[in-house]
Structure formats: C-alpha cells, structure tokens
C-alpha cells in the first residue's frame, strides 16, 4: 500500500493493534520497546530493543524508519526533536503536541486559551502542606490532586478529602510536579475519538460512555446512553479541542457530563485510546487503522468513522488481571461461547488490575449487548439468544392537544394496518414551544422519516415544525368548534415559500398516513409493495361492489 516504514515508540497493546492495522495495509512497522513486548510478538520485522525514553534507542529506531508515531505519550520529546532534525524523519503527532499533552496542567491551559471548556484547575507552586491548604481554601474539600506528568489509568491521582489528608496526599505523590482540580461532580463520563489529518481536517467517532472501576476504564457503551443533542455537543467539543493541536493522528478525548448538561474536557491522549477499542468491530474503520491512515497520509473516505450501520450498538469490556493468576481467562472463555462477542488478548503475563485484553460485543440493540455482557461477566447463567430489537419509529404523529386524538388516531390505525413503526405524542406549538423545537430538530437523528402534525384553530404546529426540520411534514387541519376547521386548513396550507407542508383535507388523518407510507415507499420497496397491495385491494373492493350492483340492481343493492 505504501513503501514508508512506520516506527512505533511503545510496544504495548495499543502498539500491537496499530501493527495489526498496518499489516492489513501492507505497511511495514518497527517497534521500540523491551524484547517480546505485545506489539513485537505479532510482527517478525527487525525491531529495536530499548526504551522510548532513551535517546540512543530512539536514534536506532529513526535510522530504520520514515515516520515515527507513539502508542504512549510518555516518551523523550527532546530526543524526537533531535532525530527529526538529524534524519528528516516525519513524526506524528508532532513532538511539540506530545510535549504539551504530556503535562496535563499545560494541556488544560492550552485548551483554555483556545476557548475549550475544561475542569477548573490550578498549578501547585510547591509540594508542601501550606500550598495545598491554600488550594483547599480556594476549592473547598474534597479536591483532586494530580501529577502533571507520567500519570496513567488513575496512577498519579489522589482525592484530598479533608485538610487532615494533605500529608498523606503529599507522601503518595511525592517528587512529582503537581496540579489540583476543583471537585467536579458529574453524571456520566463521555469520550470521543477524533482523527486529525495532516491538512488539519478532523473526523469524530461516535460519542461513547465510559464506566471506570478503580480509576481504570471498565466498560464502554457505544453509542453513549445520552440524548442526541448531548452526543453532538460532546463531539463538537472534542473536535474543537483536537483542532487546536498541530500535526496528525488519532486523539482520545475524555469528558465529564455535568448535571446541568454542561460538558467539560477532562484530558486528552495523543494516541489510540481504550475508549476506542469498540471501533474494531463496530465501525467502518477502526481507530488503529484511522491512526495509520492519518500518519502515512492515506485517504480518509466519507463516513469512515461512523458505526457500521444505523442500528449498530456495542459494548467494550476490559479484561483485567485477577488476584488469582489467569482467572480472568474465565471471562474470555464465556465470551468465546457468546454470539456476537470478540475476544482480544494482548500477550501479557498476568498481574492484578493489568490490562490483559478486551472483549467487544456488537448487536442491533443495546439491550441485546447488555444481555450478552451479563452472561460474560457471570451475572446470568444462560447464553443469550438473539433478541428481536425494537423497531425504531419511522413516522411521528404529533398533535397540539389530546382533544385532537380522535382525529389523529384514525391515521395511527392506518399506519398500524401497514405495519409501519410509529410514535404518537402531544407537542403544542404554543404551550410547549421548547419541546416542539427540540422535537423537530432531533427527529432526523432519531431515524424518523416523516412527521404528521395535526392542529386546530390557529394551527401553527405543522408549519413551525416544518421550519425546523428537513423531514417532510404532513399537516392535518382539525375541525374546531367555531369555523369548522376552515381556519386550520387556511393556516396550514398558506405556508410561505421555502417552508413546504403537505396539507390534507380537514380531519383526514387517513390520507396523511397513506401519504406517509408513499413517502417511505420512495426509498424502501417494502412500503411501495404494501401500498401497491392496498391500492389493489381498494380496486377489488370497488369492482366487487360494481359487479353486485349490476347483478342485483339498485333497488335491491
């Protein structure tokens, strides 16, 4: 695919999966790490035995390669700058980007300068009790004390619960540069993998939800169990953050979702990330292949970061070393018995809480994924069968008041007769304007294809919804108590140019539903065939009536 040789600083599980992705593209890789590291186990090329923090070892790697990249950010950045200048080797992410992200406090300062929302933090000027007491007075207790550098999987974090716990915190994090974060109570932890091309374009994978146990990522839900608006908000924030760093590659962006729905960035990793392992099985292109494409300069086609299908759901479970040697393999065996589950082991010797591998579960519903997860972790004893996923509604029937229900339920019964999945609810343009706005904007993201809106009187609902959604809207004028529905008809049908509303006769939700089925039939032959059958049935009914009338005469008919 490309004759450039890629050198990888770090041979752990992330390096191993980068190598796997590069191998499929016939791209040669050379790994710098200790002998028999996970990445070296699956690659027969001549590697470099040494440390990614050692200048001599990095020089050896640079002499063999055209491009250098990292699977861990804790590398010798000055050595990278040296080999870049001496050998002309390309390095991605750029050394300055790696250096900035290495120091978590400087990382936050950089993001703030670029208008990115982060958790409030302050540098610890001196590792002594008085400095932390002053921070406690500023932030109150508890607050989070963190190492600025060389922190990973929660190592380097300490919760300062009270003033009395300060000496213990200093002992725990002694001899490290520190910073403190104001305590951030959050509802969920979210993450987004973002790919940055050398031209500066950014592409986001779906927003996911991460569950941590003992500061280590335990489970990832993809997509995140949040509203579409929250997922989009997190994606935009993550992309804006990654845009601020020069160079290319993949970045893992971890975030907090607060109770008020505000989203703050926790930290960023300039490499593949644990929260993106699900992409191997659930997405068009894995995070590892995306990283290889970015650093080598290969094409990034449209939607390459998307989930494989619009109904794809996935759960990633980390496999951690158990207190009892190799006991974690019991989970892997159960996963091997489970349909739609894939096991990835990293070739490591076991020790407690060490990342030994991960398991991806992919299905058409999150409910099904969770059922399989329960069996794998031992919460249930029965291997789950395939669950029939609940059909997502294709048509929405909305009305301004429950008094419109007798009219709109007729259309609902038509959709039911055709087997079209639909939802029916009340959305008032005047009494619930915020709900109407949110409903109209989010409708396409939820998979809806057509909206039927019934309204009487002023009848603003169909037009207002049509103004805020790209979906086709069908208006049903509902007969009122004063002007027999003519006012509603005129209101709906007289929409300004550019805001189309297909309007049916007064109280005729039947035709609205039939029109919705025809719209669905324009892109899905299933509904086209159903409509053809419906029309044939109507014809047969009329022909049968005509035949009987002609046979018995009008007097006996």
Swiss-Prot record:
Its EC number is 4.1.1.21. PROSITE patterns: ATP_GRASP. One of its GO terms (biological process) is 'de novo' IMP biosynthetic process. SMART domains: AIRC (SM01001). The keyword Ion transport does not apply. Signal peptide: none annotated. Coiled coil: none annotated. Residues 108-296 form the ATP-grasp domain. Pathway: Purine metabolism; IMP biosynthesis via de novo pathway; 5-amino-1-(5-phospho-D-ribosyl)imidazole-4-carboxylate from 5-amino-1-(5-phospho-D-ribosyl)imidazole (carboxylase route): step 1/1. Keywords: ATP-binding, Decarboxylase, Lyase, Nucleotide-binding, Purine biosynthesis. ATP binds at residues 136-191. In the C-terminal section; belongs to the AIR carboxylase family. Class I subfamily. This is Phosphoribosylaminoimidazole carboxylase. It comes from Schwanniomyces occidentalis (Yeast). The gene is ADE2.
